[in-house]
A protein has these predicted regions:
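N-terminal glycine-rich beta->alpha transition that marks the start or flank
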Residues: 20-76
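Glycine-rich cofactor phosphate-binding loops and adjacent beta1-alpha1 units
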Residues: 184, 188-270
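Mid-domain Rossmann-like dinucleotide-binding core that forms the NAD(H)/NADP(H) cofactor-binding site
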Residues: 121-199
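A glycine-/small-residue-rich N-terminal strand-loop-strand element
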Residues: 75-99
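A structural motif shared across PLP-dependent enzymes of the aminotransferase-like
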Residues: 99-110
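C-terminal hydrophobic helical "lid"/dimerization subdomain
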Residues: 285-341
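C-terminal substrate-binding/catalytic core of Rossmann-like NAD(P)-dependent dehydrogenases/reductases
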Residues: 214, 256-307
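Short, well-ordered loop/turn sites that connect or cap secondary structure elements
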Residues: 89-91, 143, 237
């Protein structure tokens, strides 16, 4: 009998792949064979390192709570291999996306599946959750014609956000990251000026020599995953500017200086999380409309060019060790299944 291989986080910095029988199909379900799944490094490293908070509700639909052992992940692309009795057979062999943990097979109801546009490869489709996040960030930031925008952090979400922002008629768009590889990648995006991260003295000197003084930016996105970066965001955001905080920090802590210029700067701090839609938009926007925007953005940007590493699901330990110990070498890491990719 065919077995499903599922990745489990068992304790901090320990993962294992478990084999289980394929789930029996209910009448309203389909069986999906996974082609590839994407590691969301920022979120999954919190789980891998044991830095996630104990939540009464998970931040997504994957599980109702975060505790070990935990099957986690939310970016699976696969092909429908079987359909339940109540499901239209047109679903057979259809390529689909689902918010599922890393697993080689899974059963799902069709309302939890997203048909993938024919113009997108499976690897491009793996970026859907992060693209939806980027769309949500840009909507929450609401950039205005001629604004000066700064994006701190050029991981996958930062690169996608910068790519969307590059389509706006801004005065300038600046990105910053501590890793040279990510800065080089970001600098290839149209209209982006990519600089070193702002923490070190040399980096700040470079920033100022480039003509970007303190209190410069109308809109800043904090996407680095480091709570201390909020100090940089505050320092470089102009009077009455906005800071959109898209990072999930988990249990990471940092001292934030709110006693200086921040007190009189009237800066607005905006927490942005993709599970909801901003109240200002929810009367006209729903998740379906936002997903449509995300699919179209994937077709334009084609982010699979940012896939730096591909591992078999059986090599999961190597994948997380890479992201944990050598993050400067990686951008997007994918799992592949049965050499399909």
């Amino acid at each position: 009998m065919e077995q499903a291989k599922t990745l489990f986080f068992t304790t901090p910095k320990q993962v294992e792949v478990r084999e289980t029988p394929l789930p029996p199909l209910k009448a309203d379900e389909v069986l999906v064979q996974t082609i590839c799944s994407a590691i969301s490094a920022g979120t999954e490293l919190l789980v891998y390192r044991g830095q996630f908070p104990q939540l009464s509700e998970a931040h997504d639909a994957v599980s109702s709570g975060l505790k070990y052992p935990l099957a986690y992940g939310y970016a699976c692309v696969g092909k429908v291999k079987g359909v339940g009795k109540a499901v239209n057979r047109e679903w057979e062999d259809r390529s689909v996306f689902s918010f599922q943990p890393h697993t080689s097979y899974f059963a799902a109801k069709i309302e939890n599946l997203f048909p993938i546009p024919h113009s997108l490869s499976p690897q491009n489709a793996c970026f859907l959750p992060n693209m939806e996040t980027a769309v949500n960030l840009v909507q929450d930031g609401a950039p205005i014609l001629g604004e000066r925008v700064l994006v701190l952090g050029q991981g996958v979400v930062g690169l996608l956000t910068a790519s969307l922002l590059s389509e706006f008629p801004l005065e300038y768009l600046v990105t910053a990251d501590q890793f040279e590889f990510r800065r080089q990648t970001s600098g290839k995006i149209n209209k982006v000026i990519s600089l070193d991260n702002l923490n070190a003295g040399e980096a700040k000197a470079q920033f100022h020599s480039s003509g970007y003084a303190q209190n410069t930016f109308d809109l800043t996105f904090e996407l680095s995953g480091s709570p201390s970066a909020l100090n940089d965001a505050i320092e470089y955001t102009a009077f009455s500017g906005r800071i959109v905080i898209g990072s999930w920090y988990g249990r990471k802590r940092a001292e934030i200086d709110l006693g200086g210029a921040f007190h009189r700067s009237r800066i607005k701090l905006i927490s942005s999380q993709v599970s909801t839609i901003s109240p200002e938009l929810s009367g006209r926007w729903d998740k379906s409309r936002r997903f449509d925007v995300a699919w179209k953005a994937l077709e334009r940007i084609k982010p699979e060019k940012w896939v730096t590493h591909r591992f078999s699901i059986d090599e999961a330990e190597k994948a997380y060790q890479l992201l944990d110990e050598n993050p400067q070498e990686a951008i997007q890491v994918l799992f592949k299944y049965d050499d399909v990719v």
